[in-house]
Amino acid sequence: MERYKGLERLLSELEEFLFILDKENLSSAAVLKKSIVSEILQLFIKSNSSCDEEYIYMNKVLETDKKEAQGKQGKAQVLDPPAKETLTNGTAGQHLAPPQKSLPDLPPPKIITEKLPVSKCDSPEGYYEEAEPYNASFNDDGEAVSSSYESYDEDESNKSKSAMQQHQWPSTEASIELMKDAMICAFLWRKKWLGQWAKQLCVVKDTRLMCYKTSKDHNPQLDVNLIGCSVSYKEKQVRRKEHKLKITPTNTDVIVLGMQSKEQAEQWLKVIQDISGLQSDPLCDSSVITADGQRQIHPKAEGTDRHSGASESGSSTDGHPETPEIKEVKKKVTSGLKLSNLMNLGRKKSTSMESPDKALETSNYLNVLINSQWKSRYCCIKDGQLHFYQDRNKTKNAAQPVSLIGCDIIPQPTQDHLYSFRILQNGEELATLEAKSSEDMGHWLGLLLLESGSRSDPEDFTYDYVDADRVSCIVSAAKNSYFLMQRKYCEPNTYIDAPRGQRYQQDDLYDDVDMSDIQGDEPKSEEKGEAEDKMYLDLIPTRSFLHSVGIKSLCQALGSPGPERVSGKKDNEESERGTLSCREQDSSGQVTEETKQVTEDPPQQTSPGTPIIGPSVSASPRLEKSNKERVKATNHVAIETLLGKNRTEAEIKRFTEEKEKLEKEREEIRVQLAQLRKERREMKETVTNCPDKGLLTDLEDKLRLKEEQCKERESYRVDLELKLVEVKENLRKAELGPATLGTSVEPAHLDTTAPSIKSCSPTHAPECSPVTATVGSPVNSAVALKSRPQPIVTTGKVLQKAKEWEKKGAS
């Protein structure tokens, strides 16, 4: 008898002691030890309840002492499974006992209000009864789930005030480790993706919103960065008012939180708006928020963000280190998340289908180390510099921009900051940055490596404290962003056809023509009555003189034709190259011109074997004298020089020689690479089988040197391949001839429509009279254009681009 009384008194004193400890601000070790003592106490009572229960209740009925009745009441509460929350989540404090699978945790506010008014005359069975709060049900994991959410309106003052006091921060929950440095926290209703409402502990700490299933959990179910998000307050008029906050983060789905009152909603709205930096309108409308917005489309991305949340929240300006339990991340994949992926396959397009320019982002939020403190800043790459801004609006610079040219980008992961990297210039640290995930870190590494001009390979970096999967993700994202950025700068363009950082070398769109010809024809070229008749040089598609017969002799014989008045429509249609067409600028667009037959004095005697091309152009009498002088002055100048044909031939020759040289050098490098790899393989085998530790160090140094040589030659081979592709492209352009205006013509058509070349013997060269052409009717330029063959539409270089892309990817 005395034994049981002593045990009962011990239990009562121990319970009171635990209540006192709940009111104190304990360290983590003390909280852990207190939870262990409480767990042992519960297990002891549970194991002995079967034999002592009847006797204890008999004592409760017969004993009239007030103190012992209160002690027995405390023991009955310990024995009552639902009353466990009184010890752990009571009004006096919070107890961090591990959750029992067989004893689901009830929401704390529902138990507090009902367990306090207990009289000593109640029947023993009353201690085992507990009404379910509201109409909530409990699932397997002990989480309160309700199919509908109804807040208490302001007219129900008592319940509203009590609920706000129990849920609104600050509360007794603030003594928990999770609540330290929190801006605001409360038990709120969160809408799940199937429309269900679950009451969870929501905490806003630093710049993140974290939702916990219970106050004992260290791993949040939801961890979202609030920077840049939009938030709106919605009030729905139903049977009772519903106060909801709709939060739309930048990289995850919509989050809907249910509040107890309008004041609580406005308080949360203000806190989230201050963090996000976007003052969204507190719109109150009656629209129903669908459950589609809450479907978890990216469980994997959420896992990575949740993992990186430890580093980001740990890198706050407060400098408080996070506990290992918070940094630890558990991968949980539920059937609901898998089902959401299947339901949303057709809703969201893959990012690979988007254009590279759209998918390639050069600005985003990063953590920046400023004065030994991590701060979130909006970083943007522009004109070879990395700019830092306070927010996305770019209204205020947070720091001086960093020039990236010539810098070294080196990852430096630490135990607290896995995705941090540094920007160095000549060994001096310019900036230290931290990404939010492995994919984001790889993306920024690729961008910074390309902008800095560094030839470092992301695979060669050392990633401490990062596992193999995340390293693979970082390397893959870095290469992807690097090649996308390189493609953005190096993709061929009509107007900008040069890689980034190189001087733009454009093909001359117009051939070089001496100004002396034009200046000689300008004076006295027209009369007052003939002012309306103007002459234009009809630039029609021509092939390079490489494809013609008698090129050299033709180049030596012909001079430079100037803009002259043309007569001869039929001859113009027969020989479209080498003739001039007249166009009269009137409203009808037709060309009307009088037929004029003018004989021109024969040109100077040409060199032996020089052919004369026909038909020649007959000029008006007024231009005859000036034409004679011009022909004499420019007879020694080849037409190819004036029209840029010699330049084309020289370019073809130069590019051909350069291509052959590069191909030969490529083969030599391949042979060298094969030899180096063979030597490296043999050296690795030697190092593996070497028993002598003294020789092992020398062999390892030689092996490291051999690997560096392999990497250097491989990098040189990649540059050589890219240069060879560029030379081949330039050679192809040169073989097509100079750029022309208008339409393009098939080569076969040029062969058939080439003008006949009339050769004169050396002795009879002076007697060769020029051919004069006559015109039967005016020339309609529109009809002449229609009679020409249809242009060849050159579209698509898919195979060529694919091969180039494969070469870049293989390197």
Swiss-Prot record:
Compositionally biased spans, kind Basic and acidic residues: 299-309, 521-532, 566-577, 622-631
Disulfide links within the chain: none
Any coiled-coil regions, as ranges: 642-737
Domain PH span(s) in chain numbering: 181-277, 359-453
GO process annotations (BP): inflammatory response; positive regulation of DNA-templated transcription; positive regulation of epidermal growth factor receptor signaling pathway; positive regulation of interleukin-8 production; regulation of interleukin-6 production; regulation of mitotic cell cycle
Recorded GO CC terms: cytosol
GO molecular function: protein tyrosine kinase activator activity; SH2 domain binding; SH3 domain binding
Localisation: Cytoplasm
Gene3D superfamilies, per the entry: Pleckstrin-homology domain (PH domain)/Phosphotyrosine-binding domain (PTB) (2.30.29.30)
Region (Disordered): 67-110, 132-168, 294-326, 500-532, 558-631
Name assigned to this protein: Actin filament-associated protein 1-like 2
Organism: Xenopus laevis
